[in-house]
A protein has these predicted regions:
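Short Ser/Thr-interspersed hydrophobic loop/turn segments at strand-loop and sheet-helix junctions
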Residues: 38-45
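Acyl activation and transfer enzymes in specialized metabolism, enriched
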Residues: 30-34, 422-423
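Feature 926 captures the class I aminoacyl-tRNA synthetase adenylation module centered on the KMSKS loop
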Residues: 1-2, 46-88, 107-108, 112-499
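Cytochrome P450 core scaffold surrounding the K-helix E-X-X-R motif
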Residues: 4-13
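A short glycine/serine-rich beta->alpha loop
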Residues: 20-31
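Structured mid-domain segments that build the active-site/substrate or prosthetic-cofactor binding neighborhood
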Residues: 96-97
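An acidic, gly/pro-interrupted, aromatic-rich
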Residues: 70, 100-101
Length: 499
């Protein structure tokens, strides 16, 4: 933006005409008057045009004590220590994804940088490691291919389409904060939904699954490269063997297939599962313990029918019931926003507040009327509250964004408890396999030492235990020393590789 530095107008007139006004400028918020404003005044006076077209005004970087970062106070993590322990990408992402790029002050802490590694960098790296592990185990390699019609593949491609589209919009607007949030959200879907739900396909060497994850990582590394330049470079080179992710073209959303109806339904499936798992946690029902039933009431409930099996597995219930009758199991609660009502209604705002408290309001289609006043969308919040049933047998909660409610049967029976114990044994055996450094496809001889009551309890689930742990032989040794804890009960677990 400064023109004197290029000796304008005595030299470089053509260069200046092609480079002014500037595309982008960034300074901390204290330069609003001293720099941003001054540049515009000069440009307007001399050229009758703005000095720049886009601007980021960041906040003040604070130390971990909340005071302004200071060399004399040393109130910040040692930069070289941060780079050595967490990498430069961690610091870069930590700042780009923070509120500092939206003008807020921001305290830099080592804990926050460490969270970046856990929440962003490790999921990306682990996704690549997972693909390479199972592809190599089957002697297969992946390729870019969007042709799979598997429902999970279609879903992750659709989410990838939206990631590319939304991140492109954010980047074009210099909104790095939103770009980071979009990448973080996609990584959560990729690792905690797509990969986890597709594990059996990778175990069996499904080429479509391998190609899909290869394709997703190819596009994802290119999208995230400006934000995480080092780790995306290593993942991309390992994935493709090409020279550099930074020499590739930016992805185009139109090249990626999308099924928006599937996205709506599958996002609802994920909301149902996460809400139900939260209910389990709050009522001390561990995930491996099966429960009798889950009821989902939502206007979109019938669209969930093809995915009932997924919900059943995710939340570990015997039966999923779907209902479009939300009113029968939930009610709406209206909350007005006085700060938004005041400028329009003045002293009548209090009348609306009193009317809402008395229940004198109604919803007519998309319109909400309270105390005789029609409310504007920004003047209220309409929350869906699940009806409270028998607290000993039923747990309920509303879904995000008022999409419906879930009701979970939390009553326990001896049969459910027995299956839960079998699932706990599977978890312990899997941990034992890892400690024995067994390969993911190694078959085993499983030896268990269980108290008599536990052995009788899990006997009907012997085939399940063997299938889940790749055990081709199952033996019992009642006299073996029981040093492993099974929910407070000591048991014995040993594994032997068969091949």
């Amino acid at each position: 933006m400064p023109f004197a530095q290029v000796h304008y107008p005595f030299e470089n007139r053509e260069w200046f005409d092609n480079h002014y006004p500037g595309d982008f400028i960034v300074e901390y918020i204290g330069q609003t008057r001293g720099w941003f404003y001054t540049l515009h005044v000069l440009a307007t006076a001399l050229f009758d045009r703005p000095s720049f077209t886009s601007c980021i005004s960041h906040g003040i970087v604070l130390g971990d004590d909340g005071a302004k970062m200071s060399k004399s106070l040393r109130n910040y993590p040692d930069p070289m220590g941060v780079f050595d322990n967490y990498g430069a990408d961690a610091m870069r992402w930590y700042l780009l994804s923070s509120s500092i790029l939206r003008g807020s002050d921001f305290a830099v802490t080592e804990e926050g940088i460490r969270d970046t590694v856990r929440q962003v960098m490790l999921p990306l790296w682990n996704s690549w490691y997972f693909l390479s592990l199972y592809a190599n185990a089957e002697g297969k390699s992946g390729k870019v291919d969007f042709s799979s019609d598997n429902v999970l593949d279609t879903y992750i491609f659709s989410k990838l389409h939206h990631l590319v589209n939304d991140t492109t919009v954010s980047m074009d607007a210099y909104d790095l904060f939103n770009a980071c949030q979009q990448v973080r959200t996609f990584l959560d879907v990729l690792t905690n939904w797509y990969i986890r739900r597709s594990r059996n396909r990778f175990w069996s060497g499904d080429q479509q699954a391998i190609d899909t994850l290869h394709t997703v990582l190819d596009v994802l590394t290119r999208v995230a490269a400006p934000l995480l330049p080092l780790i995306t470079e290593q993942v991309y080179i390992g994935l493709t063997g090409n020279r550099s992710v930074h020499l590739t073209e930016w992805p185009v959303a139109a090249d990626i297939p999308v099924d928006n109806e599937l996205v709506i339904v599958m996002d609802l499936v994920r909301d149902v599962c996460s809400t139900t798992l939260s209910l389990r946690k709050s009522h001390s029902r561990r995930v491996r313990l099966p429960l009798a039933s889950l009821t989902v009431a939502s206007p979109l409930a019938l669209g969930l029918q093809p995915f009932v099996s997924i919900i059943t597995e995710e939340v570990n219930v015997r039966e999923v019931k779907l209902s479009a009758d939300v009113a029968g199991v939930a009610r709406h609660e209206l909350q007005v926003v006085p700060a938004a009502l005041g400028p329009r209604l003045g002293s009548d705002t209090q009348k609306v507040i009193v009317a809402v408290k008395k229940g004198d309001w109604k919803q007519q289609g998309e319109v909400v009327v309270a105390g005789g006043y029609e409310l504007q969308p920004h003047e209220y919040q309409l929350k869906l509250l699940a009806a409270v049933g028998d607290a000993d047998t039923t747990a309920s909660s509303a879904l995000p964004d008022g999409k419906g409610v879930v009701l979970l049967d939390i009553a326990l029976t001896p049969e459910l408890l027995a299956e839960g114990t079998a699932r706990d044994i599977v978890r312990i055996v899997q941990q034992t396999r890892r400690e024995a450094d067994l390969g993911v496809s190694d078959r085993i001889h499983l030896i268990l030492g269980l108290p008599e009551d536990v052995a009788q309890q899990v006997a009907p689930f012997a085939d399940y235990i063997c299938a889940e742990t790749l055990a081709e032989r199952l033996s019992y040794n009642a006299d073996a020393p029981r040093t492993t804890d099974l929910d407070g009960t000591p048991i014995y677990v040993a594994v032997e590789r068969l091949r």
